[in-house]
Every structure is written in C-alpha cells, then in structure tokens.
Swiss-Prot record:
Biological classification of the source: Bacteria, Pseudomonadati, Campylobacterota, Epsilonproteobacteria, Campylobacterales
Main location: cytoplasm
Catalytic residue list: 88, 157
Annotated compartments: Cytoplasm
Binding positions for substrate per the UniProt entry: 6-8, 163, 193
GO biological process: gluconeogenesis; glyceraldehyde-3-phosphate biosynthetic process; glycerol catabolic process; glycolytic process
Reactions the enzyme catalyzes: D-glyceraldehyde 3-phosphate = dihydroxyacetone phosphate
Organism: Sulfurimonas denitrificans (strain ATCC 33889 / DSM 1251)
Protein name, UniProt field: Triosephosphate isomerase
The family this protein is said to belong to: Belongs to the triosephosphate isomerase family.
Keyword set, alphabetical order: Cytoplasm, Gluconeogenesis, Glycolysis, Isomerase
Quaternary assembly: Homodimer.
C-alpha cells in the first residue's frame, strides 16, 4: 500500500527533517514495508531516507530559467528528488492551474522518469449535479494525461472533503474508485479528510491502494499509525 503525507505550507526546515527522521525510525522499528512518501514545503526539501521517499508538492516544467517564484528540475536534482504531486485541488482551485498547464507539467516530468502522483476530484457544486455530471468532470481531468504511464499513481480527492472534516461514505468511495480503476491500472489513492480515526476503514476498501493525507499528517504519530494500519491490512489481504 501507499501512504503519502502532503505537508502543504507547514513546518520549518528543522521540523520537517525531524518529522522524516521520526517516520523513518518508526518504519524501521515496526518492520513496515509499505511505500511511504512525504511532500514537504518547497523550502524544506531534503533527500529521501532509506524508507521515506521525499517528493515535491510542485515544480515548474523546466530545468531552470527565468520563472520567478518557481523551482525547476535543477533544484530537485540537488536533493535527488524524482517524485512529484501534480494536479492537487489547491493547485487547481486556489492557485488557478489549468488542465492545459497540468498536461505540460505532467509530460515534462514524465519524460524525466518521475514518479507522479496525479490528483483528480470534484468540487461540491459538481457533486450536487449528480453522479453522471460528477464523473464527466473527473474524466475531463484525465484528458491529455498518459493514464498508462508506468510511474503513475492517481489520487482521488473530493475537493469538498479536503480540510473540512467531511468525507464521502465508504460506499461512495468504493463506487468511485471502481469507476476510476476502469480508466487506469495505476495505483489509486484516496484523499480528502483522511485521519487516523477513519483511515483503517478506507484502506480496507476494494479499489483503494493507499491514501494521500493532508492536515492529519502534520501529527507525526498519527501518520505513523496510518502506516502501521496499512501494513496490517496489507498482511491480512495477502493471507486471503
């Protein structure tokens, strides 16, 4: 299973380094073999540890150049970073990234062989228009994206659930993941108010290959517990 922490614009460089060290220690002590990713704020980028892959929340599709306020692959190379989040709802709806710009970014980092966690999901007003309209909206986010890319991970994140404490029902998550699984064989994560009190149920659902965790991941002990839950569920599934 895949457990990913999006730390967003939180923590300092010192606190991020401590966070990753604590996660690494926990994974070692508990023999956890799941894929674990941490996406720190840009100023806090550091190299991956043995069991924690550090990725970029965002980067401009360039090696370097005159792109004020951005970072490019040259800056990521310094830390050996080869993993990136693309299409997160906050990049789409707060920063204003368009599907066309995301396609350019996706293709640039795909051509460099990056592992890409590509995010899709619907805002509340689209969800309220009904299931068919919701799936049309989500399907449009696949346009121009190579869904067969071998280093692709997809994260479904209902925009209305992010940071609100609201979550779809387990049955809703299961149903949507089933439909999205038909679009790509890539691992499919769930994101959207994932927390330590609901993650075990979410991870146990058919079609859920892991979780992308936001604010709840800021509590390192909670994130570590989520990693342990994933390990236990993975072991249980392998016995079936």
């Amino acid at each position: 299973m895949i457990i990913a922490a999006n730390l967003k614009t939180n923590l300092t460089r010192e606190k991020t380094a401590k966070y990753i060290k604590e996660v690494e220690s926990f994974l070692n002590q508990h023999n956890i073999s799941q894929e674990v990713f941490v996406f720190p704020a840009i100023s806090n980028l550091i190299s991956s540890s043995a069991n924690v892959v550090v990725g970029a929340q965002n980067a401009y599709p360039t090696q370097n150049g005159a792109f004020t306020g951005e970072i490019g692959n040259e800056q990521l190379e310094e830390f050996g970073i080869k993993t990136i989040l693309i299409g997160h709802s906050e990049r789409r709806h707060v920063i204003g990234e368009t599907q066309d710009s995301l396609i350019v970014k996706f293709n640039f980092y795909k051509n460099l062989g990056f592992k890409i966690i590509y995010c899709v999901g619907e805002p509340l007003h689209i969800r309220e228009m009904g299931h068919e309209k919701m799936m049309e909206y989500i399907s449009a986010q696949y346009v121009g994206i190579d869904a067969a890319y071998e280093n692709l991970i997809i994260a479904y994140e209902p925009v209305w659930a992010i940071g609100t404490g609201l979550t779809p029902t387990l049955e809703d998550i299961k149903m949507i993941h089933k439909e999205l699984k038909a679009k790509s064989t890539a691992p499919l994560l769930y994101g959207g108010s994932v927390k330590v009190t609901n993650v075990e149920e979410v991870l146990a659902l058919d079609g859920v290959d892991g979780v992308l965790v936001g604010s709840a991941a800021l509590y390192v002990e909670h994130f570590c517990t989520m990693c342990e839950y994933a390990q236990n569920i993975d072991k249980k599934n392998k016995k079936l």
